[in-house]
Regions:
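Catalytic core segments in nucleotide and nucleic-acid processing enzymes
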Residues: 12-167
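A short, surface-exposed helix-loop junction/capping segment
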Residues: 1-13
Length: 167
């Protein structure tokens, strides 16, 4: 995430961090969900034109991936709740409190989940490696491989791929 953040600062107007966040979440979800159980779109594809309620729709849960939670996202969460679905916001650590505060200000405290992406991914790596350090790199490698395939399938910039040497 730090590399994506640095690259984004060097290239104003780009959304590297948000793209990496969204596709790593997708890769993690691919690890646990049955194949084709949810759609994966390019990070720049807006929810509205594609008639989606969020970045990922899985059963009655709507996952929103963002590096900058704001009023528009909270409105989407309100719509999700009105439609009987459960919104989850996955964001960077620095924005978790922002999202929680926005949800609280909108009267949604306790009704919208807000997760730090690094904790979300880390917990998965530990769980799938059964907390065995010798298996952790293999699990991480699997997530990164899935991420790289998602980037190749949905994005035009192959430099978004992650190189990882499992040891």
């Amino acid at each position: 995430f730090e590399q994506a953040r640095k690259r984004q600062k060097q290239n104003p107007g780009t959304q590297y961090l948000g793209t990496v966040l969204q596709h790593l979440v997708a890769a993690k979800l691919c690890l646990i969900m049955p194949e084709n159980s949810f759609e994966i779109h390019g990070a720049s594809v807006a929810d509205g034109p594609t008639d989606r309620n969020g970045d990922f729709v899985i059963n009655n849960t709507i996952i929103h991936c963002t590096t900058m939670p704001g009023a528009l996202l909270i409105e989407k969460c309100k719509t999700n709740l009105r439609n009987g679905t459960h919104p989850v916001i996955i964001t960077i650590f620095d924005r978790v409190h922002t999202a929680l505060n926005l949800a609280e200000d909108a009267g949604l405290a306790g009704r919208v989940e807000v997760w730090d992406v690094q904790q979300f991914l880390s917990a998965n790596v530990y769980e799938h490696s059964l907390f065995d350090e010798s298996k952790r790199n293999s699990t991480l490698s699997d997530i990164i491989s899935r991420y790289n395939n998602i980037v190749l399938d949905t994005e035009t910039d192959p430099s978004l791929r992650i190189e990882f040497d499992a040891k």
